[in-house]
Amino acid sequence: MLDANLADRKVVQYVMNRVGFHAKHRLGQNFLIRPDVVAAIAEAAELSDGTPVMEIWAGIGTLTQALAETGADLTAFELDQSLKRVLDHTLEHYKNIYIIYEDVLKADLKTILGERDWHCAANLPYYVTTPILLTLIQSGLPISLFVFMMQKEVADRILAARGAKDDGALTLAVQF
């Protein structure tokens, strides 16, 4: 699927139908179908040939494809094992992608990823955004750049001023 744009709704529907995959909304599986948003995330990740980048929850490979197109050295985590057949189909031509089918919240990130200076990109489901952010912060990994698409409510909590209504543990963890 080298020439297919995975951010196109028709391509997503075709791929999902072809491999018999149905999104699991209990896992927050809502796939990006806005090419402009996917391109903006990939551009903001500041990637070039060989840049180590970690993607959290690859989904059907929409953002994964855009990140891989930069030539970055991409390691993607995916929780849902049933997406393997989708990702094998959509990303088969890319040699710079390594996918780990494991829950990033339970993975030994330091052992898996080592001490390289990482960039991190993701389209995060609402229900797990805070646990993922806290896991990454507490992992001790050398991550120099985070680029996440998330719900506005979570972003508001992250950016809240001290003492504001949305101020909390997430605010403190991210800002300090």
Question: Where are the predicted features?
Answer:
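Catalytic cores of RNA-modifying enzymes
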Residues: 1-176
